[in-house]
Amino acid sequence: MSFPYFISPEQAMRERSELARKGIARGRSVIALAYADGVLFVAENPSRSLQKVSELYDRIGFAAVGRFNEFNNLRSGGIRFADTQGYAYSRRDVTGRQLANVYAQTLGTIFTEQAKPYEVELCVAEVAHHGETKAPELYRITYDGSIADEPHFVVMGGTTEPISTALNESYKENLSLADAVSIAVKALGAGVNGAEPRTLGPATLEVAVLDANRPRRAFRRITGSALEALLPEVDSSESSNEAEAGAEKGSGES
């Protein structure tokens, strides 16, 4: 007589966690950090069409790492939820904490009930409405639905330890935009285990801000000459080689 294969709940959760962590580890890193005028997002992303950073609502931004199709579905769902809430009640009733909780509940349900967890990690950020002085809010949501608020910065992706170490050494409150971009880009290029730091140029970076000084929609992308002016000096040939080596597939990790 044969017996059905049994796996304990603890082992099932461990295997799901391992699967999700491996998927996230293959993605290039993203930084979200608070600066003097709001929140800065800097992602290592050579693709111009598959974006890791986007706007969710008037004062709320979104960043993610992992499988693009999965976090893009979550991004789209968050936008629809925010639009519905803002239409039914008031635009000011839509908050970053509210959206972070929705994402946490969704990912927690997927992790425990579906056959495969989402291989994603998310950040939801919010800045104060124009004229208010509330500090920026940063929320990290992991693949299993865990949620944490971070006071200064969030680092996500495959190589987070050297990036977090670099930011802990260089980050200060109320940085200017230029200084914030500089330390974020240098942190993204930090070497692992003593390796030489990498030089990242405009071709390999996706940069955006939530600017609390903007009257309604705070989200703004920084591209082209505006981005080049904020970056440390880079060698153009190195930047080009970095972009060619980092070409990504649309269905894979981002």
UniProtKB/Swiss-Prot annotation:
Q: Which GO terms describe its molecular function?
A: threonine-type endopeptidase activity
GO biological process assignments: modification-dependent protein catabolic process; proteasomal protein catabolic process
Q: Summarize what activates or inhibits it.
A: The formation of the proteasomal ATPase ARC-20S proteasome complex, likely via the docking of the C-termini of ARC into the intersubunit pockets in the alpha-rings, may trigger opening of the gate for substrate entry. Interconversion between the open-gate and close-gate conformations leads to a dynamic regulation of the 20S proteasome proteolysis activity.
Q: Which UniProt keywords apply?
A: Cytoplasm, Proteasome
Q: What protein name is recorded for this chain?
A: Proteasome subunit alpha
Q: Which organism is it from?
A: Mycolicibacterium vanbaalenii (strain DSM 7251 / JCM 13017 / BCRC 16820 / KCTC 9966 / NRRL B-24157 / PYR-1) (Mycobacterium vanbaalenii)
Quaternary structure, from the entry = The 20S proteasome core is composed of 14 alpha and 14 beta subunits that assemble into four stacked heptameric rings, resulting in a barrel-shaped structure. The two inner rings, each composed of seven catalytic beta subunits, are sandwiched by two outer rings, each composed of seven alpha subunits. The catalytic chamber with the active sites is on the inside of the barrel. Has a gated structure, the ends of the cylinder being occluded by the N-termini of the alpha-subunits. Is capped by the proteasome-associated ATPase, ARC.
Task: Tell me the segments the record calls region Disordered.
Answer: 232-254
Q: In which pathway does it act?
A: Protein degradation; proteasomal Pup-dependent pathway
Its annotated function is as follows:
Component of the proteasome core, a large protease complex with broad specificity involved in protein degradation.
Which Gene Ontology cellular-component terms appear in the entry?
cytoplasm; proteasome core complex, alpha-subunit complex
Where is the protein localized? Cytoplasm
